Amino acid sequence: MNTQYKLYPYRWVVLAAFAFINLTIQTLWIAYAPITGPAAKFYGVTDLQIGYFAMSFMIAFVPLSIPVSWLIDTYGFRIAVSIGALLMGIFGIVRGFAGANYTLALWSTFGLAAAQPFLLNAWTKVPANWFAMEERATAVGIVTLGNLVGTALGMVLTPILFESMTIPNIQLMYGGVAAFSAVLFVLLARETPPTPPCAPGQEVRALMLDGLKYSFTVKAFWFTLLVSFIGLGIFNGVTTWIEGIIRPRGFSPTDAGTLGALMIVGGVIGAVLMPALSDKQRKRQLFLYIAFLGSIPGMAGLTYATSSTLLYASAFVLGFFLTSAMPIAMQYAAEVTHPTPEGTSNGLIQLFGQGAVVFVYIMEAMKSADGSFTPALLLAMGLLLASLFFVSQMKDKAQ
């Protein structure tokens, strides 16, 4: 590296503060999913109305994503992410004080949902301002890990805490942690180091309109958006309804939390291992085939398993393969839309993936009379099979 460019140790402080708020927003997102049934009884509402707590995040992301990316690009990540962090801290505490008032709890959740795009859409911007090119993938990986750990914590801790705490107190505790992480970010974050970490031209913009337009002219990119829509739709659907999926088979909210956590653990391992193998082999299409094909047995087990061992193993397998598809698809999108910046192509994939909230709603609407999600899970398996056709249209870019 040219000696005029310097890397500062403080970059890890900024990254840690950023990863922490990404962790807390995910815990707030998923906190009701493993206790859907008990929460419905507490608020006196239906399972679907509890599902709105998670769905609100996906609903809010769709209209806010592009304006927030523009804000990050125009005013910098520190201002934009601080806005999101403060929204998260304020509405996290408000949700805790809502008590048994479902309406107030839901509206405060929409406030939390409005905060999420400010955090997710800066994933490439923070590393671009502070890290050298060869460190940025690692930096984004750390934020991704924080995101997944936050989801896993929400899955595991919530049903455990529910055994000794009320739902409002659980939410207030999560809100307090969120407020702490928000204050920490505002105090510690800096927009840029004193001197740049790389040569001019290597910075990444959060959104570039020219890149946006070009991306949509690439046929393979459309198929990438389709498989991302399916993959994230199924992931969000399963995590949102995790407790309802296994409840008819006699499993408890604690079982649901363990199941969700194992799915996330499998996802973390898959998201590290599969993209690394894809990089080593320099093949994207092959590993996308493996990811979607491997997800089908996991989904089948989640649909029909009646023993906890088989159910947990199925969740791990589903998480391993389904989650691993996303980083590979994102890298593929970056390659086929080059020279479009990665922030633009990845942002579009996130946008389409969050738009799959429609599948989350369809899953609940397809429940059978006895409350079983089997019809919806069979649809998910059909969509995974359809993804194999879409992947067949995603040829690797010539090296």
Predicted regions and their residues:
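C-terminal transmembrane helical hairpin of 12-TM major facilitator-type secondary transporters
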Residues: R282-A329
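Conserved MFS/SLC helix-loop-helix module at the cytosolic interface between two early adjacent transmembrane helices
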Residues: P63-N101
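Helix-to-loop junctions at the C-terminal end of transmembrane segments
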Residues: L64-G76, G270-K283
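Cytoplasmic helix-loop-helix junction between adjacent transmembrane helices
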Residues: S108-G146
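Helix-loop-helix hairpin linking two adjacent transmembrane segments in secondary transporters
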Residues: L104, I142-P193
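Extracytoplasmic gate region of multi-pass secondary transporters
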Residues: Y32-A33, V218-A261, V265-A271, V360
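Juxtamembrane intracellular "pre-TM" segments in multi-pass secondary transporters
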Residues: N2-Y8, T192-T224
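A late C-terminal transmembrane helix in Major Facilitator Superfamily
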Residues: A334-D370
